[in-house]
Amino acid sequence: MARQGCFGSYQVISLFTFAIGVNLCLGFTASRIKRAEWDEGPPTVLSDSPWTNTSGSCKGRCFELQEVGPPDCRCDNLCKSYSSCCHDFDELCLKTARGWECTKDRCGEVRNEENACHCSEDCLSRGDCCTNYQVVCKGESHWVDDDCEEIRVPECPAGFVRPPLIIFSVDGFRASYMKKGSKVMPNIEKLRSCGTHAPYMRPVYPTKTFPNLYTLATGLYPESHGIVGNSMYDPVFDATFHLRGREKFNHRWWGGQPLWITATKQGVRAGTFFWSVSIPHERRILTILQWLSLPDNERPSVYAFYSEQPDFSGHKYGPFGPEMTNPLREIDKTVGQLMDGLKQLKLHRCVNVIFVGDHGMEDVTCDRTEFLSNYLTNVDDITLVPGTLGRIRPKIPNNLKYDPKAIIANLTCKKPDQHFKPYMKQHLPKRLHYANNRRIEDLHLLVERRWHVARKPLDVYKKPSGKCFFQGDHGFDNKVNSMQTVFVGYGPTFKYRTKVPPFENIELYNVMCDLLGLKPAPNNGTHGSLNHLLRTNTFRPTLPEEVSRPNYPGIMYLQSDFDLGCTCDDKVEPKNKLEELNKRLHTKGSTEERHLLYGRPAVLYRTSYDILYHTDFESGYSEIFLMPLWTSYTISKQAEVSSIPEHLTNCVRPDVRVSPGFSQNCLAYKNDKQMSYGFLFPPYLSSSPEAKYDAFLVTNMVPMYPAFKRVWTYFQRVLVKKYASERNGVNVISGPIFDYNYNGLRDIEDEIKQYVEGSSIPVPTHYYSIITSCLDFTQPADKCDGPLSVSSFILPHRPDNDESCNSSEDESKWVEELMKMHTARVRDIEHLTGLDFYRKTSRSYSEILTLKTYLHTYESEI
């Protein structure tokens, strides 16, 4: 896994240029490799000055794949963005005469070099036909009118060493647009129905263009690749990156290794990735087709097309406006031109095509705006990155009077109809992976869908009529259904007529590398988790090696060796029962088969821990942390919730298998008035009165804030039983997480910052729980022979429940909603704990990786 930090060992290799509503968009050519840097020194901006010589010519050079350096002028796809084109670029390279299609009267025309594309008899041999030439002039069918066909092996012309990959990316394509079907988008619908598709693909947070396009290219979260927003401030650079500024041309902002650089480094040619908006879509398609016709030693293997639509129209009209139909038709028409062009070149059974979006679109207007001036008196002292999310920093850097915690307090639960929640960034849901970067402000506002946030009314721009400039926007929580986007894979390497579960866009970089036969650079994706998309797999994942093997202690200590300060053993009757209870701890029995349904979790770092068996649960107990790394138990549909006997209330039993020196002591909790304790296995779910004593062992105990204990107790007493009843039994694995540096990775001991007062008991930052059942609820969890279903949570361990504004009410009113907000992937938990789950199962490892990367969003169907 790639390090989830702003400054890792990534190589910053390219200059990313993209802007919405102006004349720039992302673009790279095969040789566009600039200085590799991720430095904090003086900026090295590509200024305008070297590109002043435009006296050369683009004759024979239009959309050349090699970037020409100064002082010569350029004719590549980005020369417009850099104002470096030769003087005749528009005249020679952007021809539009006679349009982009053949008509009957043009068939066999005399070649005219002024035409945008040709319908002459020699156009096929010269590779510059209009894409419908064969259809109109030779009687062939459009690609869309042909039946679906299963392409079992690539059918490529001689000289193609691998199937080329074309990435067709569309901005702001909400997943639900696909419901418009073949009446509006017949070509896209055919790609979907004949190839491999997901009901949606999840973008990364924030669901903005810059972060997501670069995530698609690198497989990294924004906190890892550094592009944390469409605009951002770097306190070390003391510089601001935004759409309309020159700073975005500076290499120092861009981390990671994008696909085209991975390709070039491994000897695979890459074509242009995105395009200046001044270049018409038709010209982009024709250029890609011409590149595909290049000689073998010049032809790239990977290409990309980028469309600014339907994002532009989605902002203007909203996702549900009737005006959205025409932009979608235009995109589909462009897809049809590409596929007809490929068929014309006899490449339609050779090329792999990915049709993919960067994010969705929501119905938003400026009439639904929360103003911070209604909550704060000093809004002029802060800088707010406004809109569908809020990032707050002091207007004056290093202002000693700036107090983010005070601002949080003034923004928390102040109104019953408040449409945002404030967070310190380290308290954001871990699934967002949006904290570990200095460009992410300490104070963050998660905004409710369909709403905006701004400092004050004067910051919101409206038309002179008072109406909004926009009707749609994006950027919200990436689990919200309106933010989901599209994924379709089509071609000889993708499966035929296959629907796959939703996945996150960090996974696509690895797939694209597999399609091109490349070794991926380090990234945040899980390589192999999308193997089920492909007909054949070039990469076969293997189980990670277990680093630390457990100890299996027996009864080694006497009851008298312990002084826990809270024992209740003196209340056990009869007295010889105490010995019997301890003997129970010596027996393994069948607990492993019952409670570790998918094998024992492996520890992937060096430590010492013990396997502790009990009738109702099993634990991996850490001698370092004085608590379990994990506790696993299986609850049947018929399980009953029982009460706790009075004599077991507020007491803990010693565990005679573990040294007193490696056990917690209740005296620590008596000294720390802010801390209480709870149990990883819930005593309420014990199968017998005798088994209940096991649940009160000190080795089942973990530190908990009293406020959090309300959440944990409700989860254990009510929700676990509810899930077991609904799903025909569940297996539950729970444990602590330590992530004080909020980098999304397991803390080492030196990084843990808080302990129960006067003790060596570390205080977790979070607790996790993994709940697994059979996908087919007719099968009980412990007898499942089919696919598995998983729901996972990473619950923040905090001294208050301020995140839930109704936490003063009964837990039934708010705890489950809080848990849904902190839903997570199993992979997130593995990175945060250093554990590896699901190691013993009949399912393939690729299937297990798919399960581990699944996120239960609790959203309605798209």
UniProtKB/Swiss-Prot annotation:
Summary of pH dependence: Optimum pH is 8.0 for isoforms 1, 2 and 3.
Cofactor: how bound: Binds 2 Zn(2+) ions per subunit. Binds 1 Ca(2+) ion per subunit.
Catalytic EC class: hydrolase
Domain SMB: 54-97, 98-142
High-level lineage: Eukaryota, Metazoa, Chordata, Craniata, Vertebrata
Active site: T209
Known role: Secreted lysophospholipase D that hydrolyzes lysophospholipids to produce the signaling molecule lysophosphatidic acid (LPA) in extracellular fluids. Its major substrate is lysophosphatidylcholine. Can also act on sphingosylphosphorylcholine producing sphingosine-1-phosphate, a modulator of cell motility. Can hydrolyze, in vitro, bis-pNPP, to some extent pNP-TMP, and barely ATP. Involved in several motility-related processes such as angiogenesis and neurite outgrowth. Acts as an angiogenic factor by stimulating migration of smooth muscle cells and microtubule formation.
Phenotype when changing L213A: Reduced lysophospholipase activity
Pfam entry (one): Endonuclease_NS
Residues given in the record as Zn(2+) 2 binding sites: D311, H315, H474
Any one GO CC term of the record: extracellular space
Database matches in PROSITE patterns: SMB_1 (PS00524), SMB_2 (PS50958)
Expression sites by tissue: Expressed in brain and adipose tissue.
Description of what induces expression: Up-regulated in adipocytes of obese-diabetic db/db mice.
GO MF: alkylglycerophosphoethanolamine phosphodiesterase activity; calcium ion binding; dinucleotide phosphatase activity; lysophospholipase activity; nucleic acid binding; phosphodiesterase I activity; phospholipase D activity; polysaccharide binding
Disulfide bonds: C58-C75, C62-C93, C73-C86, C79-C85, C102-C119, C107-C137, C117-C130, C123-C129, C148-C194, C156-C350, C366-C468, C413-C805, C566-C666, C568-C651, C774-C784
Full protein name: Autotaxin
Prodomain residues: 28-35
